Structures are given as C-alpha cells and as structure tokens.
A protein has these predicted regions:
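Conserved anion/nucleotide-ligand pocket segment
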Residues: 151-229
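Internal helical hairpin/lid segments
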Residues: 235-293, 297
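ATP/nucleoside-binding phosphotransfer catalytic cores, i.e., glycine-rich phosphate-binding loops
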Residues: 282-339
C-alpha cells in the first residue's frame, strides 16, 4: 500500500533551508479585547480551572475578556455546548463587541452552526477570528463567505490554559502573528515541542519536551494562499458552500490528532477523491498529536497521495494540537521555500 521516499530534517538554527514567510494583514490593528465563544464542545464547563487559567493569562497580557453567553454551561448532555441556534448566536453577538474572537476549545460539531452565522455583520466589523481543531470549520467558512483572513490553531483552554512554559510559548506566536508591526514575517522553528497528556487541572510537573525538527519531504519554493486546518473537520465540510476553493494557488495546511491508520487513510483518500492533491502548489503537514512511534505512517501516506507531485512539501510543522502551536493565517499569502 505504501512506498518509501527520502526525507530531510531541519532543526533549530537551520531556518535558511526552511522558510515560511507570511505577508501580514491586520498590521495596523490595536488589539484590546478578546471575545470567547464555544461553538462545539462545552470545555468551559468540563475544564473550569484550565479555562480560568487561560482567561487570567490573557488578562495579564492586557486584554479585556468578553465571555460568550454559553460560558460555563453544560450544554446538551455535556457533549455540545448548546442548541445550534444558541451556539451561532453566541458568536454573532460577539462580532460587533470585540477585536478578536477566539474559541474556548475544539470539539466535533462546529460545522452545524455555519448556516446561522451573520456573515454580513462579520464582514462589516471584521474582528479577527482564531479557531482550533474542530473550529477549523468556522475559520474556513468565515474566510470563504467574507474574504476576511482568519487564523489557526489556538484556543483559550488548550493553549493559554497550559502551564508554563507552553502558555508563554503559544502566546509568542499569537503576539508574533497578530501584533508585530512588520509587513512580512518568517515563522520560526520552536526549540522544543510536546504532546504529552498530563493532568490539566493541577500542576504536577512540566511536560516532557522533544527536540524540534521540521522535515523536508520535497524541495521547492511556492508563493500562494494558505488554506487548511484540521483534516477531520475539512472532510466534514468539503464540497459545501463553506469550503474555500482549492486551486493551483493553494498551499494546503493539514493537522489532526492521530487515532488510527484507517481513519487517517480514509481522510486523505477523501481529499484525493475531491482532486485536492492534484491542484495544490504546496503542502504543509503539522505534527499529529499522540502519533508517537507511528510517525512514519505520515511519510508513507504523503508519498502515496502526493509523492508524484513536484511541489514543496514540509512535514512535522507546529500548528495544531501539539505545543507550541504557531498561529497561521487562513486566506493569507505565504511563501514556502524548502532547499
């Protein structure tokens, strides 16, 4: 089923061989307020201590926090934060009130609210939207319907509710992407990363870290528009009016949590059946959380589905469920240069 292809690793200090350059938008924005919504999982109910840590962390950075009206609620059977209209309305109410809208966490059901979002109001007020995991659906839909650049992949609970040092490392990329005055930014390779699962509620020890490396699968350089996010979520909206068009100008970004080979292979097959891999001009694959010793699976799958394409392909990037997570612009213009 799978073949093999040579790969090349790039470590910290090797940025000259791997360049991801982002043409920034929002460079004149003065971010003062962050609104928090829960369009999918009721994480603010289940992870109250971690949510509070995330809110206090952002407040200590000087931001005014505006909580959506589903904050702290159990929702439907503790699995969905509220009725579909309630979840959509929570986001709609935040649109004119804040500079940034950030989701509390991911989940499984953000695609259900897409037809109830006030896209006209969002385009008019144009707050910065930051999604994570399942809320990839909103990040993609808001970009498709309004043309406004959105961002992945950070959330209040998952990223800023972390204990040190990863809350600060995640914030570095928030600040770097949204508050730098530079017009172009080169994304930096984090020194270390982690996907270790330990107690979210009470600090016991610092998470174990791994020395970081990004991996060149195919060399090349391409300037294009970044589209993508959580692959499981993309499969849930592909072919609908909410999925941005994939063209020869697209640099595709994919990430997920690794559960099993069958599910991952199915999702890549779905994208292939839609002709995605035959169109794109570049590909960035982020680290798959909890993949562990199965990391070679990613290399094999990429080789099968995209190995025939002579396009730049980067593996082991940091934008998704692992820490730290770079913040990347959906709809933004970037340059992917691998040599």
């Amino acid at each position: 089923m799978f073949g093999k292809q040579g790969i090349r690793c790039a470590r910290k200090g090797d940025e000259r061989n791997i360049k991801i350059i982002v043409n920034r938008v929002n460079s004149e924005r003065n971010i003062k307020s962050i609104g928090i919504c829960s369009p999918s999982y009721p994480g603010t109910f289940h992870y109250q201590k971690r949510y509070k840590r995330g809110v206090e962390f952002l407040q200590n950075k000087g931001f005014t926090i505006v909580e959506g009206n589903l904050t702290g609620k159990e929702g439907y059977r503790g699995e969905i934060s509220g009725g579909v209209q309630d979840r959509a309305e929570e986001l709609n109410q935040l649109i004119p009130r804040v500079d940034v809208i950030m989701t509390s966490i991911g989940g499984y059901n953000s695609n259900s609210v897409l037809k109830y979002i006030d896209y006209d109001l969002f385009k008019q007020k144009s707050p910065i939207f930051i999604g994570y995991s399942d809320t990839t659906a909103l990040a993609l839909a808001l970009y498709k319907k309004t043309g406004c650049i959105t961002y992945l992949s950070q959330s209040v609970i998952s990223n800023f509710g972390e204990f040190e040092p990863f809350n600060e490392l995640n914030y570095f990329y928030f600040d770097f992407m949204l508050q730098s005055k530079c017009e172009t930014l080169m994304v930096q390779i984090p020194d270390v990363w982690t996907d270790e699962w330990i107690n979210w509620e009470t600090y016991e020890r610092t998470k174990k870290t791994n020395k970081n490396e990004w991996i060149i699968f195919n060399k090349g350089e391409f300037n294009g528009t970044l589209i993508g996010g959580n692959i499981d979520t993309i499969v849930g909206i592909i072919g609908t009016e909410y999925m941005p068009k994939i063209t020869e100008d697209t640099i595709l970004l994919l990430e997920d949590v690794y559960t099993d080979l069958g599910r991952l292979y199915r999702n890549f097959t779905t994208l292939a059946l839609h002709g995605i891999f035959d169109k794109i001009g570049g590909l960035i694959i982020s680290k798959f959380e909890t993949i562990g010793e199965n990391s070679d699976v990613i290399n094999d799958i990429i080789n099968e589905f995209v190995g025939h394409r002579k396009i730049p392909i980067l593996l082991n990037f940091d934008c998704g469920h692992t820490h730290p997570s770079c913040l990347m612009p959906i709809g933004g213009k970037i340059t992917l240069s691998l040599s």
